[in-house]
């Protein structure tokens, strides 16, 4: 966990989008590695490790043009030898470059959605698969997070990954990867501002600018401590066989770290402009892209919903679950994924 987040943090210093695409691919590959059968792992993982194939995870059904809250509607239809799939996924980072799409969907039935949810692997060139270029955004542009429209695509049984409800039983979460990305991007902005100031004596000698630099450096350090304290707790949870209290503590720490990383990265990426002045707004400087990327990516999931989970876990610890976010899918009236 710790090494993985250090890699994402360092990549995000250079480019938040690149770090996000690696995150998407590794998370999708990790889901296949964890939930696939031995036969599926033997088939698909060598294609990734040895063949360099990419997998994009596609779960969001938050239509950018919709006026209603996102509701998971993707559901398989039984067919001879497998299933039929029709769905429209949005915000699918890596979609344009991926060889496979790991589609979050569900088997038909009356049980809550989280108990029916599983994954299917859909090849990019499969029948009924269409990419929709709807990615015209403020930032995170190079993630090329196009829509994936799938119409009556046949999914053979060997491409169904996991058992129904497998994800809410999987102890892992994605939370800290976003923390690492936000933190790394903010560190990239801060280091660019430091380089700018070092080259200009009139700025480097300003007491006001020194105060701001010291303040931002301290905020970044605090966020880094929060990230790696939570990552260490995940190491403990894995080492103790995913004991529920230890696991839940890891996710609680991760949610708090994510909240602080969102706030800190937004603050840092804005205040570096005050340090550097109007020249920092030119596209020859990296700060404007970093700011746009941070402003966009920190909206990935509604922070207020995360903080509700933290508060509820503090007020009634027995109700907190590491995978509680995904059980919100069972309550359609609740906003489950503000993208």
Describe each model-derived feature in a short phrase.
Residues 1-93:
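Glycine-rich flavin
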Residues 7, 28, 85-87, 120, ...:
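Buried hydrophobic positions in well-ordered alpha/beta secondary-structure cores of metabolic enzymes
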Residues 88-130:
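A short core secondary-structure module
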Residues 90-95, 174-178, 297-300:
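Glycine-rich phosphate/pyrophosphate-binding beta-alpha loops
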Residues 135-221:
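Glycine-rich beta->alpha junctions and the first turn(s) of the following alpha-helix
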Residues 184, 214-221, 255, 259-266, ...:
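Generic structural signal for well-ordered, non-transmembrane alpha-helical segments
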Residues 222-260, 273-281:
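C-terminal helix-coil-helix/basic helical segment that borders enzyme active sites and/or dimer interfaces
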Residues 276-339:
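Glycine-rich phosphate/cofactor-binding loops in nucleotide/flavin-utilizing enzymes
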């Amino acid at each position: 966990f710790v090494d993985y987040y250090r890699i994402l943090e360092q990549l995000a210093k250079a480019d938040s989008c690149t770090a996000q695409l690696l995150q998407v691919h590794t998370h999708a590959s990790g889901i296949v590695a964890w939930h696939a059968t031995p036969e599926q792992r033997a088939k698909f993982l060598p294609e990734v490790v040895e063949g360099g194939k990419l997998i994009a995870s596609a779960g969001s059904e938050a239509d950018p043009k919709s006026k209603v809250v996102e509701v998971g509607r993707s559901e398989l239809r039984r067919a001879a030898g497998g299933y039929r799939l029709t769905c429209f996924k949005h915000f699918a980072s890596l979609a344009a470059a991926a060889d496979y799409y790991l589609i979050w969907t569900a088997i038909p039935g009356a049980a809550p959605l989280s108990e029916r949810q599983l994954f299917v692997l859909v090849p990019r060139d499969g029948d009924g698969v269409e990419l929709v270029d709807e990615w015209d955004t403020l930032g995170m542009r190079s993630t090329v997070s196009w829509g994936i429209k799938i119409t009556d695509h046949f999914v053979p049984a060997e491409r169904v990954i996991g058992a129904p409800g497998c994800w809410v039983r999987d102890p892992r979460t994605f939370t800290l990867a976003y923390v690492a990305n936000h933190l790394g991007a903010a560190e990239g902005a801060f280091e660019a501002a430091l380089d700018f100031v070092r080259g200009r004596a009139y700025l480097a000698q300003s007491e006001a600018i020194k105060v701001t630099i010291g303040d931002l450096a301290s905020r970044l350090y605090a966020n880094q401590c929060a990230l790696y304290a939570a990552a260490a707790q995940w190491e403990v949870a894995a080492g103790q066989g995913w004991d529920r209290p230890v696991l839940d503590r890891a996710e609680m720490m991760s949610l708090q770290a994510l909240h602080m990383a969102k706030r800190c990265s937004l603050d840092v990426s804005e205040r570096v402009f005050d340090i550097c002045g109007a020249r920092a707004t030119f596209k020859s400087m990296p700060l404007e892209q970093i700011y746009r990327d941070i402003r966009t990516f920190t909206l990935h999931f509604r922070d207020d919903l995360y903080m509700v989970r933290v508060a509820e876990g503090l007020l009634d610890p027995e109700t907190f679950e590491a995978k509680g976010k995904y059980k919100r899918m069972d309550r359609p009236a609740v906003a489950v994924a503000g993208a």
